[in-house]
């Protein structure tokens, strides 16, 4: 399940930047955007399944950290969607980019810090 979740995230980020480049070039990116929305569903479902599996074995305060990681992951997905929707409507995206980047850094940090991830920190 972990590999499916990581693959879905990788494809989601690739599709996000492809859709962003299409919208910024003035072309229609609806098809790529819809594919990205499908990836959102896969990311959320696999992430929730991982979360529920972890909750069966997690001890002490790990419940809180994995819950925060899940919330940050949902914020990343929300940030991605808001950036693309605002781009398609030709509105300013500065604040939404900030949300996206802060949440993405938080997700990567927690993913590397928590016991299931790589032990970098």
Curated annotation (Swiss-Prot):
Pfam family, one: DUF1516
Annotated transmembrane regions: 6-26, 38-58, 65-85, 92-112
This protein's UniProt keywords: Cell membrane, Membrane, Transmembrane, Transmembrane helix
Location of this chain's protein in the cell: Cell membrane
Protein name: UPF0344 protein BA_1155/GBAA_1155/BAS1072
Entry similarity comment: Belongs to the UPF0344 family.
One GO CC term, this protein: plasma membrane
Membrane topology: Multi-pass membrane protein
Lineage of the species this protein comes from: Bacteria, Bacillati, Bacillota, Bacilli, Bacillales
Organism name: Bacillus anthracis
């Amino acid at each position: 399940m972990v590999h499916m979740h990581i693959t879905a995230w990788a494809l989601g980020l690739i599709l996000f930047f492809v859709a962003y480049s299409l919208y910024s070039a003035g072309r229609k990116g609806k098809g790529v955007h819809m594919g990205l929305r499908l990836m959102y569903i896969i990311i959320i479902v696999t992430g929730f399944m991982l979360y529920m599996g972890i909750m069966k074995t997690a001890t002490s305060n790990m419940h809180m950290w994995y819950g925060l990681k899940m919330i940050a992951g949902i914020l990343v997905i929300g940030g991605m969607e808001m950036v693309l929707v605002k781009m398609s409507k030709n509105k300013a995206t500065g604040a939404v980019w900030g949300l996206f980047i802060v949440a993405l850094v938080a997700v990567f940090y927690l993913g590397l810090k928590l016991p299931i991830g790589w032990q970098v920190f």
